[in-house]
C-alpha cells in the first residue's frame, strides 16, 4: 500500500543537548495510508533529509536560512527557508503552524548549521497563508518578518522567485540541513545539496492523484537516489538560473523515494500573496 508523508509538530522536553537529531523537536513527517488521506489519523515514520546529497558552498546558497526553535537552554534547527528580501523569509506553513514567533529565530549568512558570524535574528510576525490547514498539503507556505533588515553581502543575498515556466525535464537543486540517512539521527553541520529533475504536474498526478491531487500551486521533482525530507522542510528548490522554484513541502515515506516524486510549494503560483506580504 502506498504511504505518503504529511507533517505535524510535537514538542517533547528531554535532557538531550548534544548533536543527535531530536526526532520529537522538528515538524515530523508522518505517514497516512492511502485510504485515510487527508484525515488526521497520523503515525510515526522514519525521517530523512537531503539523502544522497553533497556539501554545498555558501556561495551557492547565500539566501539559505535555518529556522531555529528554542529548546531548553539552546536553539535547534527545525526547518529551512529562503531570504526573499532584507526583512522577509519564506518557508513552509507546516514549519510554523502552532508556533509562537517568540520561540523562533533565523540563522543566516552561513552554510554551517551550528554557527554564524552574523548572529541570529528573532522572528517578528509570522504570516501564514490564510487557507492553510495542518492536515492538508495545499497553500503550504509562510512568510516570516525579521525585526531588523539583514545587510546584503557576499554571504547574504536574496533569492528571486522564479517567474519563468519550469517544465518536465528541467534540472533543479534542493538545499537543506536535514538528515542525510533515512535511518540516521545526526544532522549534518554543513549545508547539503541534491540534484533533481522536474516532473510535470500531469505525470506527477498519475502517481499521487489517487492519494493527494497535485494542483497548480505545487511542483514535483524526482531523483531516485537524492531527495529532501524532514529537516529540509521549508527550504529552497532552485532552478538552473538560481531562482526560487519550490519550497520543500511533502513526499513519500521512503527516502530516497524511488519512483515517487517529492512535492514542493510553487512560489510563482502564489506570487501575488507573497508580494502583498513582503517587507
UniProtKB/Swiss-Prot annotation:
Protease that shows specificity similar to chymotrypsin. This is Mite allergen Der f 6. The active site is at residues 94, 140, 233. Residues 20-49 form a propeptide. Keywords: Allergen, Disulfide bond, Hydrolase, Protease, Secreted, Serine protease, Signal, Zymogen. PROSITE patterns: TRYPSIN_DOM, TRYPSIN_HIS, TRYPSIN_SER. GO terms for biological process: proteolysis. Pfam families: Trypsin. The keyword Signal applies.
Amino acid at each position: 500500500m502506498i504511504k505518503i508523508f504529511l507533517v505535524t509538530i510535537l514538542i517533547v522536553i528531554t535532557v538531550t543537548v548534544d548533536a543527535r537529531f531530536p526526532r520529537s523537536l522538528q515538524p515530523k513527517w508522518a505517514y497516512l495510508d492511502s485510504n485515510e488521506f487527508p484525515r488526521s489519523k497520523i503515525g510515526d515514520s522514519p525521517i530523512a533529509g537531503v539523502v544522497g546529497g553533497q556539501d554545498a558552498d555558501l556561495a551557492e546558497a547565500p539566501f539559505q536560512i535555518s529556522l531555529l526553535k528554542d529548546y531548553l537552554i539552546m536553539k535547534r534547527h527545525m526547518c529551512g527557508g529562503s531570504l526573499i528580501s532584507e526583512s522577509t523569509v519564506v518557508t513552509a506553513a507546516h514549519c510554523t503552524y502552532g508556533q509562537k514567533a517568540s520561540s523562533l529565530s533565523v540563522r543566516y549568512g552561513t552554510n554551517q548549521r551550528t554557527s554564524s558570524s552574523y548572529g541570529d535574528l528573532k522572528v517578528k510576525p509570522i504570516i501564514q497563508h490564510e487557507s492553510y490547514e495542518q492536515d492538508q498539503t495545499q497553500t503550504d507556505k509562510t512568510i516570516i518578518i525579521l525585526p531588523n533588515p539583514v545587510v546584503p553581502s557576499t554571504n547574504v543575498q536574496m533569492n528571486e522567485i522564479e517567474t519563468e515556466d519550469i517544465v518536465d525535464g528541467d534540472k533543479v537543486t534542493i538545499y537543506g540541513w536535514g538528515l542525510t540517512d533515512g535511518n540516521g539521527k545526526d544532522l549534518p553541520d554543513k549545508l547539503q545539496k541534491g540534484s533533481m529533475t522536474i516532473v510535470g504536474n500531469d505525470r506527477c498526478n498519475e502517481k499521487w492523484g489517487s492519494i493527494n491531487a497535485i494542483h497548480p500551486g505545487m511542483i514535483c521533482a524526482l531523483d531516485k537516489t537524492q531527495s529532501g525530507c524532514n529537516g529540509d522542510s521549508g527550504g529552497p528548490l532552485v532552478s538552473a538560473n538560481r531562482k526560487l522554484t519550490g519550497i520543500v513541502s511533502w513526499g513519500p515515506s521512503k527516502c530516497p523515494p524511488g519512483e515517487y516524486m517529492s512535492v514542493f510549494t510553487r512560489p510563482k503560483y502564489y506570487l501575488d500573496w507573497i508580494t502583498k506580504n513582503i517587507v
